[in-house]
UniProtKB/Swiss-Prot annotation:
Belongs to the thiolase-like superfamily. HMG-CoA synthase family. It comes from Mycosarcoma maydis. Pathway: Siderophore biosynthesis. This is Hydroxymethylglutaryl-CoA synthase. The gene is hcs1. PANTHER family: 3-HYDROXY-3-METHYLGLUTARYL COENZYME A SYNTHASE, HYDROXYMETHYLGLUTARYL-COA SYNTHASE.
């Protein structure tokens, strides 16, 4: 009997985002709001934007083809393909089935996996499915691909500045340089903070204050669950340790970097401060918290989610740690905005692109995945091999710098076009192909039966 696969994780990664973006600073002027509302209040600099030439299928085709081609992956070596998205354009047909066109020329149609959906969490559900498949008795020796991607757009109003777009594809298999640790902590519950009940529109229903509280409240619960599980694994299963001591035994200091689902930068910073608060709450008498008011330990934990004094105290307490543990993963969100299911993994691409391979060896990364409604998980990655090829293939910094900043009016007009043509039949998109990257897929036509066909920009185009 062959040995079970070891060191299962990410072997290669690719990211795709639109070629164009708008400036959040210019958007403040365009919307007539106070200066700093978007750039300081949300912590955002730019937001990726696209028009009717791109949809979730074209995003997925672009990112998976890029993963295969840049890393010389044989399509026949893939045995599973999972997709996570909340950008739904068909209530029955999955994005995964469209992606099978990339594998048909090789004759490989024996690929398991399908789409997962729950707001921004679907990519993580897809990832866990792929990891579990590789580690299971069903594994056939081939690698898996996980795709996470979305087009995040909002109706005119206060939420529009926290949109964005992008997708990430990950090659999952054994003997990987980025290894997933076995402990997961998950919290799921029923909330109505963000949802999309109107299938005739791409826009969600959003309760802004509620979604912030849900994000942070689920972080508390997922972090608790993660620490309990990680402590048990660390000690060799349950051995009489209390939950309280288990919670205190796992802390942010155990990790070199932290990554969060990233709707916008300011919420990520709140999330990091919340982790530090949870460490304090589990071990308030530790001398390292001497600068924190002692009475914070006696406050009801749930009530502190909206307590500005607590938030400010831990923002100040964690200011230095934030620069080293959090900041390296922020490039993508600041340039592309919210990528929904892909945002956490866009942060991972940023982190890898900012830290040299030799410096990141042996380091641990704590990840927080969240999707409204709500689903949340905490898990960890350990770096166990060279990341040089991953960084070289992705070429993130050059690609982010090459994005074209367009006027805000262009973005508004693109959204109006999408509104007018959403669910349209006998529709040929009007977006200009020169606005797309070389090698990108695009929507070519929607026929009288809603069937979509796609084209591709030549890879050698300017």
């Amino acid at each position: 009997m062959s040995a079970r696969p070891q060191n299962v994780g990410i072997k290669a990664i690719e990211i795709y985002f639109p070629r164009r973006c708008i400036s959040e600073d210019e958007l403040e002027d365009f919307d007539g709001v106070a200066k700093g509302k978007y750039t300081i209040g949300f912590g955002q600099k730019y937001m990726a934007c696209t028009d009717d030439r791109e949809d979730i299928n074209s995003f997925a085709l672009s990112v998976v083809s890029g993963l295969l081609e840049k890393n010389n992956i044989d399509p026949r070596s893939i045995g599973r393909l999972d997709v996570g998205t909340e950008t739904i354009i068909d209530k029955s047909k999955s994005v995964k089935t469209v992606l099978m066109d990339l594998f048909a020329p090789s004759g490989n149609m024996n690929i398991e996996g399908i789409d997962s959906k729950n707001a921004c969490y679907g990519g993580t559900a897809a990832l866990f499915n792929a990891i579990n498949w590789v580690e299971s008795s069903s594994w056939d020796g081939r690698d898996a691909i996980v795709v996470a991607g979305d087009i995040a757009i909002y109706a005119e109003g206060s939420a529009r500045p926290v949109g964005g777009a992008g997708s990430v594809a990950m090659l999952i298999g054994p003997d990987a340089p980025l290894v997933f640790e076995p402990a997961h902590g998950t919290h799921m519950s029923n909330y109505w903070d963000f949802y999309k009940p109107n299938l005739s529109s791409e826009y969600p229903e959003v309760d802004g204050p509620e979604t912030i509280q849900t994000y942070l409240g689920c972080l508390d619960k997922a972090y608790d669950a993660y620490r309990l599980r990680a402590a048990k694994l660390k000690s060799g299963a349950a051995n009489g340790h209390s939950d309280a001591s288990s919670l205190a035994s796992i802390k942010v200091d155990d990790f070199d970097y932290t990554l969060f689902h990233s709707p916008y930068s300011k919420l990520v910073q709140k999330g990091f401060g919340r982790l530090l608060y949870n460490d304090f709450f589990s071990d308030p008498k530790n001398e390292k918290y001497a600068s924190i008011p002692a009475n914070f330990a006696e406050l009801d934990r749930k009530s502190t989610i909206t307590n500005k004094d607590v938030e400010k105290a831990f923002a100040a307490f964690g200011k230095e740690a934030q620069q080293t543990k959090l900041e390296p993963g922020m490039n993508t969100v600041r340039r592309c905005g919210n990528m929904y299911t892909a945002s956490l993994y866009g942060g991972l691409v940023s982190l890898l692109s900012n830290i040299p391979s030799q410096e990141i060896q042996g380091k641990r990364i704590l990840l927080y995945s969240f999707g409204s409604g709500a689903a949340a998980s905490m898990f960890a990655i350990r770096i166990n091999g060279s990341t040089e090829q991953i960084v070289k293939a992705v070429d993130l910094k050059n690609r982010l710098d090459s994005m074209k900043v367009v006027p805000c009016q262009t973005y508004v007009e693109a959204l109006k076009t999408r509104e007018a043509t959403h669910n349209a039949v006998n529709h040929k998109p009007v977006g200009q192909l020169e606005n797309l990257w070389p090698g990108a897929y695009y929507l070519e036509n929607v026929d009288h039966m809603y069937r979509r066909t796609y084209g591709r920009i030549p890879t050698n185009a300017n």
